[in-house]
């Protein structure tokens, strides 16, 4: 404790956060969904030291490229959507530290130069941590750390149009963008990302446009912040129970008058996009 009577960062009581994984294809709207959740919870205006909910992106864990790889990346010839593009070991250790309530630093990745910036992002202990990325469910060791898993399901044409606009704003030409998409992005989505959809407790069609889903998830997180987190820390509530209870809530909102379930209810619901590659 310092002279003013306040606890320093390394003296704060540590607690285990509720870890939520948010996956989905490139430009599906994962980052925007997370940002909307933060906004609705009123956490986006709270000082980073005091936030009860925080966001960490898998983008921070892209590997440092060799000169040869960087040259390919600048030509749109490097596969950023393959599992090997990420430093999985570093990512796993960082998540373990977060779950243990530690203060961690994660890299800032520059998608224009394809390199890590000197500035790092400091992630402080929070009650709920949203970890978003295209392949956050791919590795079992990472997947098993999540207490809840959400998949943002957005139409492929919408994702492509968003990606084209985003990458052109970064100075890339249309031909390079489309070549990279057909050569790397689309095949990698179908091989590595889409199959992990089956692990999701919550599926969010149309992303941030689906405010019914967003509001249900926000309410669920609010319940955790209001006390359920204490229950699951004591062992009476676990991550799978949280996922099932949310599914039931979504199903109740998604039933048709005939009593049959809409597409919304096949699995619960969440999204516009700031995917790098």
From Swiss-Prot:
CDD domains: UMPK. The keyword Secreted does not apply. Substrate binds at residues 81, 109, 114, 163, 172, 180. ATP binds at residues 24-32, 209. One of its GO terms (biological process) is CTP salvage. It comes from the Eukaryota. InterPro entries: P-loop_NTPase, PRK/URK, Uridine_kinase-like. Residues 241-277 are annotated as: Disordered. Keywords: ATP-binding, Kinase, Nucleotide-binding, Transferase. Phosphorylates uridine and cytidine to uridine monophosphate and cytidine monophosphate. Does not phosphorylate deoxyribonucleosides or purine ribonucleosides. Can use ATP or GTP as a phosphate donor. This is Uridine-cytidine kinase 1. The lineage of its organism: Eukaryota, Metazoa, Chordata, Craniata, Vertebrata. The gene is uck1.
């Amino acid at each position: 404790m310092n002279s003013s009577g306040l606890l320093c960062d390394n003296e704060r009581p540590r607690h285990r956060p509720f870890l939520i994984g948010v996956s989905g294809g490139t430009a599906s709207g994962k980052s925007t969904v997370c940002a909307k959740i933060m906004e609705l919870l009123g956490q986006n205006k709270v000082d980073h030291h005091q936030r009860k909910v925080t966001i960490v992106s898998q983008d921070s864990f892209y590997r440092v490229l060799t000169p040869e790889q960087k040259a390919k990346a600048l030509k749109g010839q490097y596969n950023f959507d393959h599992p090997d593009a990420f430093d999985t070991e570093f990512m796993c250790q960082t998540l373990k530290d977060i779950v243990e309530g530690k203060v961690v630093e994660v890299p800032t990745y520059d998608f224009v130069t394809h390199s890590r910036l000197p500035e790092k992002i400091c992630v402080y202990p929070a009650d709920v941590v949203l970890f978003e990325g295209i392949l956050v469910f791919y590795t079992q060791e990472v997947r098993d750390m999540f207490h809840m898993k959400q998949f943002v399901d957005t139409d492929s044409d919408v994702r492509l149009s968003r990606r084209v606009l985003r990458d052109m704003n970064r100075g890339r030409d249309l031909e390079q963008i489309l070549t990279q998409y057909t050569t790397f992005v689309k095949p990698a989505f179908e091989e590595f990302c889409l199959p992990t959809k089956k692990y999701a407790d919550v599926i969010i069609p149309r992303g941030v446009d689906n405010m019914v889903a967003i509001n249900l998830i926000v309410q669920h997180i609010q319940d955790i912040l209001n006390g359920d987190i204490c229950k699951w820390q004591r062992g009476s509530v676990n991550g799978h129970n949280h996922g099932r209870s949310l599914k039931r809530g979504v199903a109740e909102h998604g039933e048709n008058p005939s009593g049959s379930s809409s597409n919304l209810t096949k699995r619960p619901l969440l999204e516009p996009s700031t995917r790098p590659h």
